[in-house]
Amino acid sequence: MFTLLRCLVTAVALLIVLCSAQAQVQPKTVSDRQDLINWYYAATFGTGVYTAGDRSVSVLQLPFSHAIKTVADDGIGLKFKLAATLGFYDYNVDSVFGGSVPDRLSTFSVLPGVEWEFPLSRRWTIRPYFDAGVGQQLAGRESAWIYDFGVKSRFLLGEDQGVEFALVNSLTSAGYRPRGGPTRPFSYFATGLDLTIPTGHELFGRTAFIGFTPVYINYFSRFGFAEFRDSNNKLREEFELAVSILARKPWSLKLFDFDRIGIAVRSSGDVTGVSLFTSLPF
């Protein structure tokens, strides 16, 4: 199992390096640093790096969460979440291997929220949620209020000898309001298949599983990165492949509860990213 963990960490590093290298050869250009900011995307992307045009943003996210009550308590679960995110412009993560670390923080955001869990049946669970916070660009005066709300769904399609095959969906309404500007709302639908396979081993006292999750994300209106209407930096859809190690019962580190850890590669053609995550967006 520890060999598997080492392979996962190595894969994260290699994918981040490849994604950073791609940012150096992208032909499209972004005229200003503000062009690259989509406050919601940066605050919810996770830990990793994404590129748009010839710019890159490296992100470090600290995702805290704590179960206030579980389904086992009274049939309804409730979880508090807090995502603190640090962003670094034009920092190639492969520089870490040369001993170089970023000398300036570019953006900072805090996004607290709550999530409920309602089991509708043995196979079907829904999770309504709400998040609201703020992002700040430290190199200037740019800032924004950030929010999202929606519902997640997980439906177990089948299981055999510990292997589970589930349909996962989420419907989200979100947006951000830059300082001195109008609110920029949007919404999207995400759907995927979550395949979990038992490993036959334990990890930190929990039976461990391997998860494979291909995801398709559709934005109901074009999701823009460019503040100046640069059509080269707008999304309509994204594809993601996530690979993870997970447990049925979450691991708990005081105020930090998580049930899986993995990597996700995301691409839309114009924007590409790779991230480390501790929970699926479903």
Regions flagged by a language model, labelled:
Residues 62-68, 110-118, 134, 149-157, ...:
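Residues on the lipid-exposed face of transmembrane beta-strands in outer-membrane beta-barrel proteins
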Residues 45-51, 84-92, 118, 132-138, ...:
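Transmembrane beta-strands of outer-membrane beta-barrel pores
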